Regions:
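Conserved N-terminal phosphate-binding loop of PLP-dependent enzymes in the Aspartate aminotransferase
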Residues: 1-277
Length: 277
């Protein structure tokens, strides 16, 4: 924040929703935590809603540790934004295109944002491309203005034909191979495999939704910030790639994953965690 905060002034932050004392080992959306959405209302009372342009949120926090929203949380955020005429923007760079078994997290949670940011899965990350989807009301507001202009927000490589071709081909594969449904069908298999690791050495929490999961470690033995990278290294040496960040692992298998591959992932994690003392 010291380095980047001054570059983006006028931004307030909601508290994240993870609380291991109240929601550890939740499968899917935690039961506890809906009240945390009302922190947005408190911020708006302090700042005056008329000064707030938009609320930007990841429906599921991805690289920050797979923080799954409590039941009703996103619905409440939508309700507050609508009440105060504030735009709701979903960052679906990670959750979009099948990761949660649906085209978008907005579909999974039945919450309609005003804008969706997307990338990664748009081209299967084979070539850089991102996009923003707008609600028609925003588009129409611009195009029917007294002096209409285009929805101008372009860069040097906007609409790059190679990236667009990759995106179209990727969308075809999603449809032809029914990958969103495969992710949906594999979710309970993935969930069971991950939560079978509960009770292992220094495991503080396991959480999951769709084909996203995280294992959080405590420092009851060696420091968690040393434990997580050692688990990563052990898995890597056994040809299973997970991601570590400080004191947790993120597991996010590809949309084509099958039960035998999920079993291999959980076996590698079990062996790695059990080997460290």
């Amino acid at each position: 924040r010291k380095s980047f905060g001054p570059l983006l002034p006028g931004v307030d932050h909601l508290p994240h929703t993870w609380d291991p004392e109240n929601m550890a080992f939740s499968k899917g959306q935690p039961e506890w935590g809906l009240h945390l959405a009302d922190e947005l209302e408190k911020i708006l009372i302090l700042q005056d809603p008329a000064t707030v342009a938009a609320v930007i949120i990841e429906p599921v926090i991805g690289s920050g540790g797979v923080i799954v929203p409590p039941k009703g949380y996103l619905e409440r955020i939508r309700e507050i934004c609508t009440k105060h005429n504030i735009l709701l923007i979903f960052d679906e760079v990670i959750t979009g295109f099948g990761r949660l078994g649906h085209a978008f997290a907005a579909d999974r949670f039945s919450v309609k944002p005003d804008m969706i940011c997307m990338a990664k899965g748009l081209t299967s990350a084979m070539i850089p491309m991102s996009a923003v989807a707008f609600d028609n009301s925003i588009y129409d507001q611009i195009m029917t203005a007294e002096t209409p202009i285009e929805l101008f927000h372009g860069y040097t490589y906007s609409g790059h034909p190679v990236a667009c071709a990759a995106g179209l081909a990727t969308l075809d594969v999603y449809e032809e191979d029914d990958l969103f449904n495969n992710a949906k069908n594999m979710e309970p298999v993935f969930e069971e495999a991950l939560h079978s690791l509960k009770g292992l050495n220094q495991v503080l929490d396991i959480r999951n939704i769709g084909l996203m999961g995280a294992i959080h470690f405590n420092s009851d033995g060696i420091p968690a910030k040393e434990f997580a990278p050692r688990v990563f290294q052990h898995c890597y040496e056994n040809d299973v790639l997970v991601r570590f960040s400080v004191d947790y692992l993120v597991i996010s298998p590809s949309l084509i994953v099958q039960p035998e591959q999920i079993e291999r992932i959980s076996d590698a994690l079990r062996a790695a965690i059990s080997s460290i003392n």
